[in-house]
Amino acid sequence: MQNQLLINGELVNGEGEKQPVYNPATGEVLLEIAEASAAQVDAAVRAADRAFSEWGHTTPKARAECLLKLADVIEEHAETFARLESQNCGKPLHCVISDEIPAVVDVFRFFAGAARCLNGLAAGEYLEGHTSMIRRDPVGVVASIAPWNYPLMMAAWKLAPALAAGNCVVIKPSEITPLTALKLAELAKDIFPAGVLNVLFGRGKTVGDPLTGHEKVRMVSLTGSIATGEHIISHTASSIKRTHMELGGKAPVIVFDDADIDAVVEGVRTFGFYNAGQDCTAACRIYAQKGIYPQLVEKLGAAVATLKTGAPEDESTELGPLSSAAHLERVCKAVDEAKALGHVNVVTGGKKVEGGGYFFEPTLLAGAKQEDAIVQREVFGPVVSMTEFDDEEQVLAWANDSQYGLASSVWTQDVGRAHRMSARLQYGCTWVNTHFMLVSEMPHGGMKLSGYGKDMSVYGLEDYTVIRHVMIKH
């Protein structure tokens, strides 16, 4: 397994403390990797800063060609990436191969094209005797912090727009799941000029803090928890760095009486539990209207109970383990607290799976109330709550009564209602009669404490640029 860092175009061993990397399906140590030292963090940022003077002025075509080469290389090594991701995250291998790797490749190819299609206000004489034009230039050195739930995909979401726009990047994957990012570093080394892309390994306090706080870093992009986002915003405030934050969610799934109940059941079974529920857009907070609620509890409970947990390499496995022992304990605690309330009914699941690895049973909790922590706080596991509602106004108020604002869905056959709800839900994305669908052409990002800034789409590309006005007197 590739365990070296990429700094200034060279693969080097970390000079810091060694950290274990686990297989969450077994709890066994896969390998130990040495963190970047403080000197190596500094070297990576300064290499990126030096490279920016040239990379930032390359043509969009040249940058696009590099991204297309990287996409091709990932596609050629798809099985290697999939196996690393499966081993390091516990994801079912067939899901990584069929869903995640193609999506990663598509993101790089999309931004390769988007780099050549930026547009803006037309140049013109908005003041007599003066011609104005708008430039959209790269920001500079971007520090990117990727999460542990989709390590390779989130790295792609950060690298592709930043590099396409002409920035240079120093990326730190999660210390829990670094293997695919380090493999990516090995393959990208000969595609990009030295210093354009740098990949580090280490914990937040030893590598993340000196990276995000570095004087030469002009922008920090994070996908992570609210707590981590708060820390980075505070840590970088004195240097007024641009920040780009995607900080989690608690997606409401609003099911009206006229919804296609079978479609809802299939949707929640799939999109509430994909990646063991470790997804900030997971369909985890169901509000069902009183007419459909009892039947939905029964049907969904039966469907969720059929989800198969198991070894990631088994093609019949649908639900892998949680990412770490610590996260398994957090999920156990959240469910135990809900059960202790008395009014929450465990329809199915509700406890960890005995044996090796960090597995938790697919869980459906009915009877949850709006004020319950299981409704209000992100669990980030295979746990879905159900709450009964009366009418449109009540459920709209409840859905928006959340610190999160990333994703939501509405299930109804009434087109007018779908439009009304979509217009008033305070979420970065609202799906109607589906959930979890993402495409490279459309933006993904949150509101409220779910953060700000967009991933994917031309809006994501624009987030990694600065707008400049040039006026010429004549």
From Swiss-Prot:
One of its GO terms (biological process) is L-lysine catabolic process. PROSITE patterns: ALDEHYDE_DEHYDR_GLU. The active site is at residues 246, 280. Pathway: Amine and polyamine degradation; putrescine degradation; 4-aminobutanoate from 4-aminobutanal: step 1/1; Amino-acid degradation. The keyword Hydrolase does not apply. One of its GO terms (molecular function) is aminobutyraldehyde dehydrogenase (NAD+) activity. Its EC number is 1.2.1.19, 1.2.1.-. NAD(+) binds at residues 146-148, 172-175, 209, 225-228, 280. Belongs to the aldehyde dehydrogenase family. Gamma-aminobutyraldehyde dehydrogenase subfamily. This is Gamma-aminobutyraldehyde dehydrogenase. The gene is patD.
